[in-house]
Amino acid sequence: MPITYHYEIDTKVIRAKATDLVSTKEILDYVTNIIEDTKIEKGFIEVVDFQTVSDLAVTYSELDPFPYIWEKYMKKGCKAVVIYAPTNLSFGTFRMLQTAVMIRHEVAENLFVVVRSKEELEVKLKELIA
């Protein structure tokens, strides 16, 4: 599976890693797994690392379900999502997704964050856990 994750119970942080070619279906499958995972507690923070992704097979029209999925994340008790997207392709794609979610749900930018560096990621994560 191109996106795997583990849940840190003590910090309520989901650390996910995407690899290889990632499609919209694989992202949707991953998100469904998070929503259905009964071990994940309310107040979780999701961190997804796209550093080792070789390509994203995603189109704008395929992103249409994502704002609705955000509703399910909120119902599950998501505190924030942080996407580490260091390449131009991944950063641009996830900024597009971030905008779609923010427009649909009037989500504050600090709840759905896309960062380009590990340093930004660690700063944001410390801020959210505190």
Residues of each region from the PLM?
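Amphipathic, Lys/Arg-enriched alpha-helical "gate/interface" segment within cytosolic domains
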Residues: 2-130
